[in-house]
């Protein structure tokens, strides 16, 4: 019995395979003659299809039909993003006389394919597409032809990403440009700083070299002067005129006359050197054991005032050398005082061409000494310095020039801070002795005499009035001497004594 059932089922299946229910004439063509096309479709869109049998083309529920109308089929496993190229199979392999019968399956199949194609065309044109899997090609179709990706056909997020990358690249390029410019500016700044430093070093070297050259020239000049002085001392020469390159007897004669005239008034210039030497020795003790040698040089250079330069340059150079205690080293120091003098003013002061007299020279010397002493007092802060300088200089001048102390003793009367007048002692005594009778007040004189019983006190008061240049007191005590004593008869002796006392002071 069981064998019979199996045989019956076999013949049934065989019969159905030979005599199938054909719903349309193109079913056989679709699954027989055009099976390759259907297999291609099933391979692409229906991988789960069963050898071309329309298992997935049966009528579906309303939800499935809605999905199909929207281009989606959840049951078919349709891949929307794959490239496809579907030929219209409904008219393929049909003869001209063959009748076309549209079945329900064909209707569903055709509507589904049309909806899918329309949906994909709309998606291809829409800007809200999903990104393609391959970056070099667009996975959508436009008229069944694959289209390449274009910049104007990018998706919104891709375009925004590309714009962002372009902006970032611009910022990167700008940053690189600014960094390069900054490096160039830094290199230029360093180069300028290096050039400035080199220039400063060069200027400093030039200045030092110039100072060294000047110092060497001064030292050579000083050595020549010392050598010349030593030669003159050895030869016992009073003056000398050095020969130049071009012989000019007339010019030599003029220079010889100048030297001769200066040598005849040697005391005038010696006193100037004495003053400068006194200033020098007030700061440098030349009697110390470590002192070796020193020098004072005075240079006066000038040109023809008509050439436009009417200034005479005065250079006073001071030099000192000392031996280091306990060593073989020698310390040397040099300093120069540079100034200038207007030659036109000098020529105007000496327009007559004559030399100053002794009195005129003394007057100028006192003015100069007062100005120098004032400056030294400010610099040295020594209140006795200028006083000692004045007394020493005046007494030295009196001794060197053999001035008669009786006839020519001079006194200095300071009229203001800048001028000092000179008067002889006999002029002051003559003025002091001018006493009129009506000026004598006997009562006052008697009162003073009672307080001063000794003549030594009267003489002391007279001396103080002479020293202080108090003409009123001098007249008063001179009158006392004339009125109440015989000392007045020997007043000349008294004044000589006063001169001696003043000189001793």
From Swiss-Prot:
Coiled coil: none annotated. Its main location: membrane. The chain crosses the membrane at residues 485-505. Residues 1-24 form the signal peptide. GO terms for cellular component: membrane. It is found in: Membrane. The keyword Transport does not apply. The keyword DNA damage does not apply. Residues 188-221 are annotated as: Disordered. It is a single-pass membrane protein. Keywords: Membrane, Signal, Transmembrane, Transmembrane helix. Monomer. May form multimers with an unknown protein(s). Addition of antibodies against PIMMS43 to the infectious blood meal significantly reduces transmission of malaria parasites by A.coluzzii mosquitoes. Involved in ookinete evasion of the mosquito complement-like response, oocyst maturation, sporozoite development and infectivity. This is Ookinete surface protein PIMMS43. The lineage of its organism: Eukaryota, Sar, Alveolata, Apicomplexa, Aconoidasida.
